[in-house]
Amino acid sequence: MIGRLRGTLAEKQPPHLIIDVNGVGYELEVPMTTLYRLPKVGETVTVHTHLVVREDAHLLYGFAEKRERELFRELIRLNGVGPKLALALMSGLEVDELVRCVQAQDTSALVRVPGVGKKTAERLLVELKDRFKAWETSPAMFTLVSDGPLPVASESSAEADAVSALVSLGYKPQEASKAIAAIKDKAGLSSEELIRRSLKGMISK
């Protein structure tokens, strides 16, 4: 089992990234909440990981902090929730926000996540309520905090990367493009910031 990786961030193509550890490149998929906190390509990064073994592939998922990984593990234990849906939920909501939704049994934010209807949201909240009794919301203490502004990319490539990332989370291409287009003053924003703002807009509607 691979529990943690520390190395050089070699590639970043939302929601995928490659970390070079002593010459070996590990490909991971991460929730957008982790992606926002990644340093620039070429810098050192540490992520907590979860390995999913399938007949046709070994899939590695990365998280900024242990709480995120534990949440992911709780989610994929639920009936009908695979890694893709778990990442979509975690990309739209921070850990504390999702915990608060569970505590309040509030489906309003969950139903805006692709693949989650009202009945599914209600079932997830009921199943998670007992599991989350031991969880307490607290300010997130991430290991991947960047003190500076997010890196700036060219407008066309940043928007294309953002649309691609949203589609990978389950949004339709038209929905993703519309969400990006609705962002005001987006010139010069990185793909990470475009993803963050578009998800916030779609989840909060």
From Swiss-Prot:
<dbReference type="Pfam" id="PF14520">
    <property type="entry name" value="HHH_5"/>
</dbReference>
<dbReference type="GO" id="GO:0048476">
    <property type="term" value="C:Holliday junction resolvase complex"/>
</dbReference>
<dbReference type="GO" id="GO:0006281">
    <property type="term" value="P:DNA repair"/>
</dbReference>
<feature type="region of interest" description="Domain II">
    <location>
        <begin position="65"/>
        <end position="143"/>
    </location>
</feature>
<dbReference type="InterPro" id="IPR010994">
    <property type="entry name" value="RuvA_2-like"/>
</dbReference>
<keyword id="KW-0238">DNA-binding</keyword>
<dbReference type="GO" id="GO:0000400">
    <property type="term" value="F:four-way junction DNA binding"/>
</dbReference>
<dbReference type="InterPro" id="IPR036267">
    <property type="entry name" value="RuvA_C_sf"/>
</dbReference>
<dbReference type="GO" id="GO:0005524">
    <property type="term" value="F:ATP binding"/>
</dbReference>
<comment type="subunit">
    <text>Homotetramer. Forms an RuvA(8)-RuvB(12)-Holliday junction (HJ) complex. HJ DNA is sandwiched between 2 RuvA tetramers; dsDNA enters through RuvA and exits via RuvB. An RuvB hexamer assembles on each DNA strand where it exits the tetramer. Each RuvB hexamer is contacted by two RuvA subunits (via domain III) on 2 adjacent RuvB subunits; this complex drives branch migration. In the full resolvosome a probable DNA-RuvA(4)-RuvB(12)-RuvC(2) complex forms which resolves the HJ.</text>
</comment>
<comment type="similarity">
    <text>Belongs to the RuvA family.</text>
</comment>
<keyword id="KW-0234">DNA repair</keyword>
<dbReference type="InterPro" id="IPR003583">
    <property type="entry name" value="Hlx-hairpin-Hlx_DNA-bd_motif"/>
</dbReference>
<dbReference type="InterPro" id="IPR012340">
    <property type="entry name" value="NA-bd_OB-fold"/>
</dbReference>
<dbReference type="Pfam" id="PF07499">
    <property type="entry name" value="RuvA_C"/>
</dbReference>
<dbReference type="InterPro" id="IPR011114">
    <property type="entry name" value="RuvA_C"/>
</dbReference>
<keyword id="KW-0963">Cytoplasm</keyword>
<dbReference type="GO" id="GO:0005737">
    <property type="term" value="C:cytoplasm"/>
</dbReference>
<dbReference type="Pfam" id="PF01330">
    <property type="entry name" value="RuvA_N"/>
</dbReference>
<feature type="region of interest" description="Domain III">
    <location>
        <begin position="154"/>
        <end position="205"/>
    </location>
</feature>
<comment type="function">
    <text>The RuvA-RuvB-RuvC complex processes Holliday junction (HJ) DNA during genetic recombination and DNA repair, while the RuvA-RuvB complex plays an important role in the rescue of blocked DNA replication forks via replication fork reversal (RFR). RuvA specifically binds to HJ cruciform DNA, conferring on it an open structure. The RuvB hexamer acts as an ATP-dependent pump, pulling dsDNA into and through the RuvAB complex. HJ branch migration allows RuvC to scan DNA until it finds its consensus sequence, where it cleaves and resolves the cruciform DNA.</text>
</comment>
<dbReference type="InterPro" id="IPR000085">
    <property type="entry name" value="RuvA"/>
</dbReference>
<keyword id="KW-0227">DNA damage</keyword>
<protein>
    <recommendedName>
        <fullName>Holliday junction branch migration complex subunit RuvA</fullName>
    </recommendedName>
</protein>
<dbReference type="InterPro" id="IPR013849">
    <property type="entry name" value="DNA_helicase_Holl-junc_RuvA_I"/>
</dbReference>
<dbReference type="GO" id="GO:0009379">
    <property type="term" value="C:Holliday junction helicase complex"/>
</dbReference>
<dbReference type="GO" id="GO:0009378">
    <property type="term" value="F:four-way junction helicase activity"/>
</dbReference>
<feature type="region of interest" description="Flexible linker">
    <location>
        <begin position="144"/>
        <end position="154"/>
    </location>
</feature>
<feature type="region of interest" description="Domain I">
    <location>
        <begin position="1"/>
        <end position="64"/>
    </location>
</feature>
<dbReference type="GO" id="GO:0006310">
    <property type="term" value="P:DNA recombination"/>
</dbReference>
<keyword id="KW-0233">DNA recombination</keyword>
